[in-house]
Amino acid sequence: MSSDNRVVHVVYGSQTGNSEEIARTLLQKIQDAIAGSGSTCIVDCKPLNEWTTTYTQWNSERALVLVVCSTTGNGDAPVNACHFWRQFKKRSQPKDTLDNTRFAVMGLGDSNYDKFCNMGKQLNRRFGEMSSVPFRELCCVDEALGLEEQVDVYLEEIVPRVCRWLLRA
């Protein structure tokens, strides 16, 4: 399998901008790491709502979906992810909608609330129900402990891993 056939979708659900900023940082770090490799693989970044009608096209062993999503209100999806979530969670969807698609979810939340990282947990569960392949275990980032250090640890681990997957011949 050529790396030129591989696609990384970095998608986010963000209420206050933290998840979007993390997603864009992740995108930039991946792009910087593969620069000069000669690879023409595709790496993009969009809010989850922009993927509502196209996520069924992710169904491919050549696709990797990296989700960064915060939880808002009483365990709810952020405004730029709520339409996606309504569609994505429908039980009428075929179980193999995302067959062989790799995924990793980073959920942002605050452990002072009962539904800590609820959206990240729900998205992670739903990807699994739709026959996706975990690329990495769920990462729950606790805003009560400060985001920066936790996010840095995640990025230091996942970026090289994504690059190895992208550039694997």
Model-derived regions: residue spans:
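FMN-binding flavodoxin-like domain, especially the glycine-rich phosphate-binding loop
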Residues: 2-7, 12, 17-18, 32-33, ...
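Short acidic loop-to-helix transition motifs that present clustered carboxylates
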Residues: 45-54
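A generic structural signal for short, well-ordered alpha-helical segments in conserved domains
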Residues: 23-27, 124
